[in-house]
């Protein structure tokens, strides 16, 4: 699993603000507005306990601190426990947390202790980035290119199919692409005869996975994938609306989904 680095999370508040203004330009709503409209829920200062976890590759510098800044940005009352792991979980509950946020190297979860609802970051991230892309006000058709059909990309592509979009899918893993084509009934995209899209959704751990041949002027590229799916040069050349942020939008999706 591709893990975040402390560098990915630098200036998380600036990254969130920048992503929010792009989301507003693309959909007419800010991230809060999209989450509220999509999930039908609104935060009202729920107490969120953020528990650092030392397993596997261990604690990621400023991961917990970023989650605190993100939860505050979206209207929650949050704290990071002083202890990690089991002791931290105990500390969070004893200090009145209604929602637990914690992540090991494979699963990043949000658990609402009051209503029992639980969310996983990977599907929640794919679905919210796909939802934002699907709300692009200037889209010229219902055709979408989805690049990367893994733990984040597949749920996002499935969400776009469910919303009635014509999804053209691509993944470097041919077997996975074939399975996704049959599971979701999407069209396999062939890089050898490309066409241009006004909506592109990318979720891969590789850079430059969206070729120039598929980019149309002012298209939306909604991409949780890290590193970025296109170069700064291509983004400027085509006036691409790039929705890309390392942690906050996916975390908001998790939290709104369990309220
Ligand atoms: N921004 C955010 O909030 C979040 C970002 N992520 C990031 O999203 C990315 C995807 O995560 P997962 O879905 O969990 O990974 P995954 O490994 O389950 O799926 C990635 C997929 O991309 C495909 N792929 C790799 N290189 C490719 C290429 N050049 N062209 C086409 N397909 C290619 C792989 O075959 C794989 O199927 C990672 O970079 C991860 O760090 C994950 C969660 C949240
Ligand atoms: N155990 C560590 C956190 C590990 C998080 C690993 N997961 C990722 O990097 C995923 C989450 C969103 C994007 N990638 C800590 O508590 O500091």
UniProtKB/Swiss-Prot annotation:
Keywords: Amino-acid biosynthesis, NAD, Oxidoreductase. One of its GO terms (biological process) is pyrrolysine biosynthetic process. Its EC number is 1.4.1.-. Pathway: Amino-acid biosynthesis; L-pyrrolysine biosynthesis. Transmembrane segments: none annotated. GO terms for molecular function: oxidoreductase activity. The keyword Oxidoreductase applies. L-pyrrolysine binds at residues 4, 53, 60, 103. Catalyzes the ultimate step of the pyrrolysine biosynthesis pathway by converting the isopeptide (3R)-3-methyl-D-ornithyl-N(6)-L-lysine to the 22nd proteinogenic amino acid. This is Pyrrolysine synthase. It comes from Methanosarcina acetivorans (strain ATCC 35395 / DSM 2834 / JCM 12185 / C2A). The gene is pylD.
